[in-house]
């Protein structure tokens, strides 16, 4: 039980009227790290601990287990890069231009294929968005990032193509995000699946446009983990990645 505490006694405190809307926190968008949708793999710690299920989703910051299928309103897109070593994340480039350890990405050897072994540095497609069927407080969805890399790169290109060919804004559509199990000689893992669910309603479009103006180019995404994307060890005989 929570112990009963004494009331705070400050002159004039009883006359103060609390604001209806939150006060200015003094934080700019650059001070905020956007939570990320984690796709749980069979090797993920949260799966082995019984918290989540393989192929499921989780909020990377709060640990909230998310629905099996996500309805997302994407409001922008940007690319980043990440390289993992034996001890975890080794180098990170939030903008895909310059890494935190190895300098300019365009001059980095870790971007190249070597003897059919894929690049050690992975390209990440980031989609800041709102989950419309989860993570809602007081009727307002909270922003989060959907990140796709490695074996989900094909899905990212499909999503990018769908939006580019529609000649519409990211926030004009609501997409359904799910996962699919893949088995091959490299193991068992899950990849993202995406399809357009419907056109966004006017209030959703306004929310997406507002978020685009507020956040685009002014945010960092919570760090990826190596389990977020399955990394094939080498190309197949045909020279292609066995996705």
Q: Which sequence ranges carry the predicted segments?
A:
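Intrinsic-disorder/low-complexity, polar/charged segments
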Residues: 43, 95-96, 145, 149, ...
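Extended serine/threonine-enriched, polar tracts that run as long, contiguous segments within proteins
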Residues: 123-199
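OB-fold ssDNA-binding interfaces and closely related basic DNA-contact patches used
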Residues: 1-139, 184-185, 197, 240-243
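Long, highly charged low-complexity segments enriched in Glu/Asp and Lys/Arg with interspersed Ser/Thr
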Residues: 75, 84, 185-243
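Short glycine-rich, low-complexity/disordered patches
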Residues: 86, 91, 121, 173-178, ...
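Detector for methionine-enriched segments
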Residues: 39, 58, 89-92, 148-149, ...
């Amino acid at each position: 039980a929570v112990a009963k505490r004494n009331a705070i006694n400050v002159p004039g405190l009883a006359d103060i009227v609390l604001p209806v809307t939150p006060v200015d926190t003094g934080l700019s968008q650059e001070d905020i790290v956007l939570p990320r949708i984690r796709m749980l793999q069979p090797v993920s710690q949260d799966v082995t601990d019984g918290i989540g299920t393989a192929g499921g989703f989780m909020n990377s910051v709060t640990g909230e287990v998310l629905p099996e299928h996500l309805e997302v309103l994407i409001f922008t897109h940007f690319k980043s890069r990440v390289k993992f070593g034996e001890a975890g994340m080794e180098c990170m480039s939030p903008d895909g231009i310059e890494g935190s350890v190895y300098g300019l990405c365009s001059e980095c050897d870790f971007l190249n294929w070597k003897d059919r072994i894929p690049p050690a540095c992975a390209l990440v497609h980031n989609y800041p968005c709102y989950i419309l069927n989860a993570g809602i407080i007081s009727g307002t969805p909270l922003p989060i990032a959907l990140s796709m890399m490695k074996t989900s790169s094909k899905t990212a290109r499909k999503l990018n193509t769908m939006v580019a060919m529609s000649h519409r804004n990211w926030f004009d559509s609501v997409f359904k995000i799910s996962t699919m199990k893949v088995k091959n000689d490299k193991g068992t893992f899950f990849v993202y699946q995406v399809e357009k669910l419907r056109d966004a309603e006017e209030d959703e479009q306004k929310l997406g446009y507002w978020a685009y103006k507020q956040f685009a180019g002014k945010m960092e995404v919570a760090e990826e983990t190596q389990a977020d994307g399955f990394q094939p060890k080498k190309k197949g005989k045909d020279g292609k990645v066995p996705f």
